[in-house]
């Protein structure tokens, strides 16, 4: 699938003239002030200004050496020897990074932290209701959930290279799903939970998804979006072979189609807690993210591992 670029257009403003004319002079002055970071903040920075300038200069003068060193920060199953392979000739644009390297993104995000950070927080989930307590999910818990979801996907016939559309609110299961796909070599595509059934159907069909992961409803700002109902409407325009994995997030009642819809909570609870990470080439597709469509039909941008 080709890589595309798009530009972001700001929405037209409901007033004419400069925005500054609408802001009181005193507030305008404050908006133009600069705020230097505190000495404590500066002392704890991973990279200070001088080091940044040094790194940037080397990245320009010796890009292969610079990125070869940066690649050492990752855990590789096979370390790359070919770092940068690019061509910008007209009609022959080709960009490859670490093309003979082998790794697994999920392993780098989760597994390698278990030795020293198993009980540290990996994800903080803030529920929509401000009165509900935040959830702190440790690396050990994240590892368990990701492995279980990976095994669920395998049980549903998802294989290396298959596409999985994720149509979820910002809940932990969204992170589990992305990492589970990376673990088994499936390609995920996030669809914003505020998108319409038509937009969802277009993306499912365009990438040829085998699975859609959604939730019953998505609470936001005191309101609920019926994600499962939207998914039902979208799948009317998709192949009848697409399966639907449903996260019971709010517990709201939803329609259910036997043979197509699957209770993801139940399957994860009963799935095996271990799934070995698949070796993936650095240039293997990791995810597909669709452009806004401001220049026509949304285009799938493929991001490599």
Residue ranges and their predicted role:
Residues 60-82, 100-124, 283:
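A short N-terminal helical cap/helix-turn-helix that marks the beginning
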Residues 109-137, 251-255:
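AMP-dependent adenylate-forming
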Residues 119-121, 245-247, 257-290, 297, ...:
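Conserved pre-ATP/AMP-binding loop-to-beta segment of ANL
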Residues 164, 181, 285, 291-294:
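Conserved S/T- and glycine-rich ATP-binding loop of Class I adenylate-forming
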Residues 183-266:
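Structural core segment of the AMP-binding/adenylate-forming
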């Amino acid at each position: 699938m080709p890589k595309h670029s798009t530009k972001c257009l700001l929405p037209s403003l409901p007033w004419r003239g400069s925005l500054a004319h609408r802001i009181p002079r005193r507030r305008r002055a404050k908006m133009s002030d600069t705020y230097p970071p505190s000495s404590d903040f500066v002392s704890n920075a991973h990279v200070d200004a001088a080091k940044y300038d040094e790194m940037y200069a080397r990245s320009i003068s010796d890009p292969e050496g610079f990125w070869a060193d940066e690649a050492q920060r990752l855990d590789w199953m096979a370390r790359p020897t070919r770092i940068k392979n690019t061509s910008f000739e007209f009609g022959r644009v080709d960009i490859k990074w670490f093309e003979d390297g082998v790794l697994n993104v999920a392993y780098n995000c989760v597994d390698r932290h278990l030795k020293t950070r198993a009980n540290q927080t990996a994800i903080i989930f803030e529920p929509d209701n401000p009165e509900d307590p935040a959830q702190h999910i440790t690396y050990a818990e994240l590892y368990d959930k990701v492995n279980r979801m990976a095994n669920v996907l395998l049980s549903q016939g998802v294989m290396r290279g298959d596409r999985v559309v994720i149509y979820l609110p910002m809940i932990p299961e969204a992170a589990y799903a992305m990492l589970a796909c990376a673990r088994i070599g499936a390609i995920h595509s996030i669809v914003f939970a505020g998108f319409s059934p038509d937009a969802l159907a277009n993306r499912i069909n365009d990438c040829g998804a085998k699975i859609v992961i959604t939730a019953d409803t998505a609470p936001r700002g005191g309101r609920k979006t019926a994600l499962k109902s939207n998914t039902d409407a979208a799948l009317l325009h998709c192949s009848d072979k697409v399966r639907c994995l449903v996260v019971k997030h709010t517990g709201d009642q939803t329609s259910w189609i036997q043979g197509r819809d699957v209770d993801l909570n139940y399957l994860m609870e009963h799935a095996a807690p271990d799934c070995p990470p698949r070796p993936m080439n650095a240039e293997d597709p990791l995810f597909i993210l669709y452009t806004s469509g401001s220049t026509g039909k949304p285009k799938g941008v493929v991001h490599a591992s």
